[in-house]
Amino acid sequence: MTQDDLAFDRRHIWHPYTSMTSPLPVYPVQSAQGCELQLASGEQLVDGMSSWWAAIHGYNHPHLNAAMKTQIEAMSHVMFGGITHAPAVSLCRKLVAMTPEALECVFLADSGSVAVEVSMKMALQYWQAKGESRRRFLTFRRGYHGDTFGAMSACDPDNSMHSLWAGYLPDNLFAPAPESRFDGEWDERDIVGFARLMAAHRHEIAAVILEPIVQGAGGMRLYHPEVLKRIRRMCDREGILLIADEIATGFGRTGKLFACEHADITPDILCLGKALTGGTMTLSATLTTRAVAETIRNGEAGCFMHGPTFMGNPLACAVANASLELLARGEWQVQVAAIEAQLKRELAPARAAETVADVRVLGAIGVIETHQPVNMAALQRFFVEQGVWIRPFGKLIYLMPPYVISPEQLSKLTDAVLAAVAHPAHFAP
């Protein structure tokens, strides 16, 4: 890329969560291979983000590339209305087989946020078909479900960027975020606020929606599996649907194939995305039970009212099939367990740093929470100088590396994080 390209980028192109008039610096990437990004300037950066948690097999994986090359020779896209094709059928067959038994109906969409929108629309249409006006969703504070309007309405209304949209979004119900840590003691008080809200509004609630075990972009918080068990029982008792948003956690990130497995529960609706294609193309899936699908079918519309232009994109489905084939080999379990052990060992010294409030690890997720917000520009520059790509936010420096990362590459990431928290200049005063 030329300096003119970078100047055009700075003046004309919005990047995620970035000002157009005073944007943060961007780093031009020329190529990616395995677990490393090569900058246009020639530096190699070990990637600790998996491109926002999606590239679980690393970059330029030959099995994924081969699947896309083969598919693009046949067709890159065809509409899914009135048409079907082998890549979509094969993918949905795999998803039905690998998710909990009750989840047998699949809706393919284009992104994680859309998968959440689809799940919420399913819940609303379900109750419309049953003749009940249930239009609210119950969830936890500190949650994050995406940036589209329906998804935003289920995100924390106060402790997130979505407070900007107060007054425009549907009025949903928010219980206090769970405080019992994943690896700690269960505190019965953790579910009291949630239970009270459900009891008070049970005839208004279409569904509970939550991120199982890991509250991702809302704070990278890891909570106790008992929370899920209690909520599943409450939903069963009140006849309320349970939506599990596993966009970030699905496909092995927490050490289980799906985070719901930590509590041995099955949701009524399951949202998947990010790692579905191994980080190569945008694709998501929303799965539900036969009972939910048939109830929607019997409603006034006679069908589920949603249909994205790129629904079931053959190219994305083909590479998703290849990604799931890699997962089916089972190597991810050993890889994630090794990453977890190394993260626990190598991030532990950060607890002694004055800048650090907490350190937590689960599966291939390592989180350092700091007392003060990070100085994004300064810290990003520092990480690049250290030869790593880590994208902190708020008071969080976290790692979600590809599963195929080597111990040496992972140590380079953890060394950079330890060096970062040793310097107060990397944080807001």
From Swiss-Prot:
Q: Which UniProt keywords apply?
A: Aminotransferase, Biotin biosynthesis, Cytoplasm, Pyridoxal phosphate, S-adenosyl-L-methionine, Transferase
Pathways per UniProt: Cofactor biosynthesis; biotin biosynthesis; 7,8-diaminononanoate from 8-amino-7-oxononanoate (SAM route): step 1/1
Output the Gene Ontology cellular-component terms. cytoplasm
Enzyme group, top EC level? Answer: transferase
> Binding positions for substrate?
52, 144, 274, 307, 391
What's its EC?
A: 2.6.1.62
What's the protein here called? Answer: Adenosylmethionine-8-amino-7-oxononanoate aminotransferase
Write out the catalysed reaction: (8S)-8-amino-7-oxononanoate + S-adenosyl-L-methionine = S-adenosyl-4-methylsulfanyl-2-oxobutanoate + (7R,8S)-7,8-diammoniononanoate
User: What organism is recorded for this protein?
Assistant: Pseudescherichia vulneris (Escherichia vulneris)
Pfam families, from UniProt? Answer: Aminotran_3
Question: Per the record's keyword annotation, is Transferase included, yes or no?
Answer: yes
Quaternary structure, per UniProt, is: Homodimer.
Names of required cofactors:
pyridoxal 5'-phosphate
Please list the GO terms describing molecular function.
adenosylmethionine-8-amino-7-oxononanoate transaminase activity; pyridoxal phosphate binding
GO BP terms: biotin biosynthetic process
Q: Where in the cell is it found?
A: Cytoplasm
- Provide the function of this protein: Catalyzes the transfer of the alpha-amino group from S-adenosyl-L-methionine (SAM) to 7-keto-8-aminopelargonic acid (KAPA) to form 7,8-diaminopelargonic acid (DAPA). It is the only aminotransferase known to utilize SAM as an amino donor.
Which coarse location class describes where this protein primarily resides?
A: cytoplasm
PROSITE patterns listed in its UniProt record: AA_TRANSFER_CLASS_3
| UniProt similarity note | Belongs to the class-III pyridoxal-phosphate-dependent aminotransferase family. BioA subfamily.
Which residues does this entry assign to the site Participates in the substrate recognition with KAPA and in a stacking interaction with the adenine ring of SAM?
17
Q: Where does pyridoxal 5'-phosphate bind?
A: 112-113, 245, 308-309
CDD domains assigned: OAT_like
